[in-house]
Amino acid sequence: MSDTDKEIIQRVLEGDIRSFGILVDKHKAKAMTLAVRILKNRQDAEEALQDTFVRVYRALPSFEWRSSFSTWLYRIVYNTCVTAAGKKGEAFRLSLDTEGDHEAKKEIVSNELLPDIQLESSEFEDIVREEVEKLPPLYGSAFTLFVIQEMSLEEIVQVTGIPLGTVKVRIFRARGLLREAIAKRMDFALAEE
């Protein structure tokens, strides 16, 4: 049975440095996925994640459990990566190139966009990935956090600092843009709803 974040954090606050390593190991995979999507470069993401965990360690005594630890952590990852992208003069965009996104791509398309299409071919997967990457950054970030990271709307609000209504609108618009773009690329006519 694994320890809860609260138990691990309590041990860290009591001076057990090894427990911080346990906390990092527990969350680094998902944090890295988010960092790679934002920065689109594994090396930059690793550097940003190192900065993130230093910030987390320093701020841990002030963490108040108003949200889950993972939500708080993702907020720090998000802010650190957006800042890093800005310093490099790059536009903030999220990517679907990270390993393990195959199932997420299937879900994006089969559940929400074009329910009659089976996501079997690599060509179709490429189209989906390309169109998600073409989303305007404002829509792409909210959409990716919701669909790929499987965050709740409330968690996205906490991570990004964007109001709930705005998050909902951005996800809705992202889905609409994807539906149109994928249908156009696949030469399907959009059915009137």
Kindly label every feature range from the protein language model.
Residues 82, 128, 139, 145-148, ...:
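DNA-recognition helix of helix-turn-helix
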Residues 13-14, 40, 53-68, 87-88:
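Sigma70-family region 2
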Residues 1-30, 37, 116, 154-155, ...:
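N-terminal module of bacterial RNA polymerase sigma factors
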Residues 24-42, 59, 132, 181-184:
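Amphipathic, Lys/Arg- and hydrophobic-enriched alpha-helical face
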Residues 61-65, 75-96, 182-184:
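Arg/Lys-rich amphipathic alpha helix in sigma70-family domain 2
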Residues 2, 91-118:
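Internal acidic/polar
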Residues 13-22, 32-51, 164, 187-188:
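Short, charged helix-capping/linker segments at alpha-helix termini
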Residues 33, 47-54, 67-79:
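Structural recognition of an alpha-helix C-terminal capping motif at a helix-to-coil junction
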